Amino acid sequence: MNGTEGPYFYIPMVNTTGIVRSPYEYPQYYLVNPAAYAALGAYMFLLILVGFPINFLTLYVTIEHKKLRTPLNYILLNLAVANLFMVFGGFTTTMYTSMHGYFVLGRLGCNLEGFFATLGGEIALWSLVVLAIERWMVVCKPISNFRFGEDHAIMGLAFTWVMAAACAVPPLVGWSRYIPEGMQCSCGIDYYTRAEGFNNESFVIYMFVCHFLIPLVVVFFCYGRLLCAVKEAAAAQQESETTQRAEREVSRMVVIMVVAFLICWCPYAGVAWYIFTHQGSEFGPLFMTFPAFFAKSSSIYNPMIYICMNKQFRHCMITTLCCGKNPFEEEEGASTTSKTEASSVSSSSVSPA
């Protein structure tokens, strides 16, 4: 084995020289240069600095403007809440531990950090799935006369929390476990060992199938069908400039959504699966660090994609930030009037929210 396994940790370094120490008790500067820990702390500070305001602003603006309190926006708010979970439950602790060079918060802190980071990430992931299903139901109309209402939104919220808990809770109760990973300053699922009594293998397979592959298939299916529906509407009314604009807008939105989903999760999932299927092979501490912390950046670009592309929300946000006035009101108004409408794709169905 090209690593050192101990009680509730795995260090990606063989302890031939005797320098390997518990990541709960000693700085891990023998893994990487101390400057790397400082850089990690600075990166986490940047995520907090940007992630907290943009997600808090999402909640505040929606509460401030009654017209934004629509059933679909409940899911978008859920996305913001999930991102705040990641900011407070994961980013702050990682910034603090990276300043010390090891997971100074101990075993309990590792469980809490791993749980909140996993919970927030999974709530966000399943919120995107619910959004994809809602867009498909409204635009493609597999059920005639379907209208997404408050009851559907509440069921969607409950679904995201149940699925997230189904992934984040088991490691706390003995099905797998949370351990420090990468540079040993943050905690995640144990992909690294076959620790006796924790059934890591079955949990990792369950997690990949139910909490990665299935969401991926659903997102691709729903947005693929949505894009086809918009193309069909545009083909039926080729003379309509607004319909052509609808096709372009939705195409751009779909591409951004799918690419962001892949950029966020595929590197982390790919590296985690490689480590799981090649346990004991040689890899450095940065091998898992880069994809893990890149995935955390979803707390920033998720709200930018799913909320800031919403014309109505953008108008309300500018109004809130500018003390009740929107200096770009004419431009926003012109943009709103040109909002796409088609016989088979309504304007509310085409816009991101």
UniProtKB/Swiss-Prot annotation:
Disulfide bonds join 110-187. GO terms for molecular function: 11-cis retinal binding; G protein-coupled photoreceptor activity. Glycans are attached at residues 2, 15, 200. A motif ('Ionic lock' involved in activated form stabilization) lies at residues 134-136. Belongs to the G-protein coupled receptor 1 family. Opsin subfamily. It is found in: Membrane; Cell projection, Cilium, Photoreceptor outer segment. SUPFAM superfamilies: Family A G protein-coupled receptor-like (SSF81321). A lipid is attached at residues 322-323 (S-palmitoyl cysteine). Residues 334-353 have a biased composition (Low complexity). One of its GO terms (cellular component) is membrane. It is a multi-pass membrane protein. Residues 1-36, 97-110, 174-202, 275-286 are extracellular. Keywords: Cell projection, Chromophore, Disulfide bond, G-protein coupled receptor, Glycoprotein, Lipoprotein, Membrane, Palmitate, Phosphoprotein, Photoreceptor protein, Receptor, Retinal protein, Sensory transduction, Transducer, Transmembrane, Transmembrane helix, Vision. It comes from Chelon saliens. Phosphorylated on some or all of the serine and threonine residues present in the C-terminal region. Contains one covalently linked retinal chromophore. The chain crosses the membrane at residues 37-61, 74-96, 111-133, 153-173, 203-224, 253-274, 287-308. GO terms for biological process: absorption of visible light; G protein-coupled opsin signaling pathway; visual perception. The record marks 113 as: Plays an important role in the conformation switch to the active conformation. Photoreceptor required for image-forming vision at low light intensity. While most salt water fish species use retinal as chromophore, most freshwater fish use 3-dehydroretinal, or a mixture of retinal and 3-dehydroretinal. Light-induced isomerization of 11-cis to all-trans retinal triggers a conformational change that activates signaling via G-proteins. Subsequent receptor phosphorylation mediates displacement of the bound G-protein alpha subunit by arrestin and terminates signaling. This is Rhodopsin. Residues 330-353 are annotated as: Disordered. Residues 62-73, 134-152, 225-252, 309-353 are cytoplasmic.
